[in-house]
């Protein structure tokens, strides 16, 4: 079987290389003449693409960079929200020029410098809530970033395996064409000797045509696999010319662990659940804000000390502060006139308290009702997300079990093909079959081995998908020995 595999890969070399590297003109030649030109074409300038290189390239792909940028945007939004929640300093000034009475009075000028410092001090302040919203958004972005990276890694592993499988399939298809051509030559000789009917010869011709069509489709599959890998990586790639040049297929994974434990883990870290939980928290914050807006009066208290102005004079140097209970913002002010107010300004203390409470027609009750409905909808969305995650993990676990069953089936099929090959070789030694029958048995065994490789690779990808669904997969720890 190893001899046939080597022959199949050599036969498939020109076809696979034509799909993964720039085409080179070649004149028709006999099989014996086609071997020498293979040496220079088998020395490409680009290195053989390995899975480790693929995983390195995917970290520079557009999808990876886009996920990084989205997370960075969430970080900047949080920094901006925290900056808005800090101290705010405002400096201003005003100037006036007054003449009273207009006909006989003197021009009096005055200029005042003012400064104000304000900050949010109560927990329900809008700026504090903005920080909490930005923190939840960053948490969502972090979960989305991790999921995007894991998804890209799994896609890269799957695309690399698909390219390997397509290349192996193309080589086997070319080997099938060569075998069908030899069988047709024998059939023509038998027909010339009138040993078989014309219908048998036509069947051989049809078999060759079918093999050629299958080989063409296999070459197209190689091209599509290379294109899909290039689209994922965001750059052109050169695939290995033969399946043997790819990284080896990994061993079959173990059966999934306790599904309930995987579901429990997924419910804590899946981005869908984190996103829905954050939306519920946002809806709860809106509901609390609407409740406070309805129940708290618009209350503000202030104090001012310094050279307070009388009814006929201007104020002098003053300091003061105020607190708005509803907005949760406290502020301190200082006023410094550039002109001495004189005797009219006396040192004193002023206290103020303002309050207003809407009684009818404010619409705040409607806003609270709407916020309650939004909170209930968000709670339902969270429950739906949790159920979806539960179902997804259990489905991925079932898919892995199915893939492992197919590995066992492919292993049994390979054992049967190898037993048939051994029997056919023994029958050849006894003179009961022809060498073409042995070649057909060797090709069948090679196809069974390729089917086992494909089933094993599919089981490996299924295990990665389950690990992704249960949030156990770390994109930095994926085994590159594929």
Positions of PLM-derived features:
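Amphipathic alpha-helical coiled-coil segments and their boundaries
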Residues: 53, 58-60, 67, 120, ...
């Amino acid at each position: 079987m190893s001899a046939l595999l080597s022959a199949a890969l050599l036969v498939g070399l020109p076809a696979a290389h034509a799909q993964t590297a720039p085409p080179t003109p070649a004149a028709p030649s006999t099989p014996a003449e086609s071997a020498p030109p293979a040496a220079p074409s088998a020395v490409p300038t680009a290195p053989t693409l390995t899975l480790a290189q693929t995983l390195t390239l995917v970290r520079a792909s557009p999808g990876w960079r886009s996920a990084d940028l989205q997370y960075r945007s969430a970080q900047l939004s949080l920094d901006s929200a925290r900056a808005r929640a800090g101290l705010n300093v405002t400096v201003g000034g005003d100037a006036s020029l007054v003449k009273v009475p207009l006909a006989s009075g003197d021009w009096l000028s005055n200029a005042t410098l003012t400064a104000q410092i304000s900050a949010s001090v109560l927990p329900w302040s809008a700026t504090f809530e903005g920080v909490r919203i930005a923190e939840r958004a960053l948490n969502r972005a972090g979960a989305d970033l991790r999921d995007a990276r894991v998804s890209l890694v799994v896609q890269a592993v799957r695309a690399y395996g698909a390219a390997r499988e397509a290349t192996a399939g193309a080589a086997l298809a070319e080997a099938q064409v060569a075998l069908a051509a030899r069988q047709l030559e024998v059939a023509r000789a038998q027909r010339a000797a009138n040993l078989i009917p014309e219908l048998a010869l036509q069947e051989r011709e049809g078999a060759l045509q079918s093999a050629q069509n299958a080989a063409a489709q296999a070459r197209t599959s190689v091209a599509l696999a290379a294109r899909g890998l290039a689209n994922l990586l965001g750059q052109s790639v050169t695939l290995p010319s033969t399946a043997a040049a790819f990284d080896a297929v990994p061993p079959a994974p173990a059966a999934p662990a306790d599904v309930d434990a995987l579901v429990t883990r997924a419910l804590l870290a899946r981005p869908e659940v984190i996103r829905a939980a954050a939306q519920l928290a946002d809806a709860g914050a809106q509901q609390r804000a609407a409740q406070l807006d309805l129940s708290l009066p618009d209350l503000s208290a202030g104090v001012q000390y310094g050279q307070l102005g009388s009814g006929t004079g201007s104020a002098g140097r003053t300091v003061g502060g105020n607190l708005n209970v509803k907005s949760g913002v406290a502020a301190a002010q200082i006023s410094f006139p550039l002109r001495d107010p004189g005797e009219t300004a006396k040192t004193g203390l002023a206290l103020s308290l303002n309050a207003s409470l809407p009684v009818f027609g404010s619409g705040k009750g409607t806003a609270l009702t709407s916020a309650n409905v939004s909170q209930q909808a968000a709670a339902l969305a969270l429950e739906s997300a949790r159920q979806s995650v539960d179902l997804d993990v259990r489905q991925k676990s079932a898919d892995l079990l199915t893939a492992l069953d197919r590995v066992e089936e492919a292993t049994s099929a390979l054992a049967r093909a190898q037993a048939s090959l051994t029997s056919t070789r023994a029958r050849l030694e006894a003179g009961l079959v022809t060498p073409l029958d042995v070649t057909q048995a060797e090709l069948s065994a090679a196809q069974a081995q390729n089917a086992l490789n494909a089933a094993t690779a599919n089981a490996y990808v299924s295990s990665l998908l389950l690990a992704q669904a249960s949030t156990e997969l770390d994109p930095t720890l994926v085994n590159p020995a594929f």
